[in-house]
């Protein structure tokens, strides 16, 4: 690596809205504020909701089901 051409690599803190604080490395040099992290994201916490599309599929079949029949 060449000397004096690379940005300075610093440790910064990333603070989530849930209160979780993570220390990460960055060349930006500013502390970050996150909206969501691994501690509060629904996918990682297991509180993910399943979207029910059954009603949409039935509505589609009712509207266009007769077109496929000969």
Curated annotation (Swiss-Prot):
Pfam families: Ribosomal_L31. Signal peptide: none annotated. One of its GO terms (cellular component) is ribosome. InterPro entries: Ribosomal_bL28/bL31-like_sf (IPR034704), Ribosomal_bL31 (IPR002150), Ribosomal_bL31_A (IPR027491), Ribosomal_bL31_sf (IPR042105). Keywords: Metal-binding, Ribonucleoprotein, Ribosomal protein, RNA-binding, rRNA-binding, Zinc. Its cofactor is Zn(2+). The keyword Zinc applies. Binds the 23S rRNA. Belongs to the bacterial ribosomal protein bL31 family. Type A subfamily. This is Large ribosomal subunit protein bL31. It comes from Psychromonas ingrahamii (strain DSM 17664 / CCUG 51855 / 37). The lineage of its organism: Bacteria, Pseudomonadati, Pseudomonadota, Gammaproteobacteria, Alteromonadales. The gene is rpmE.
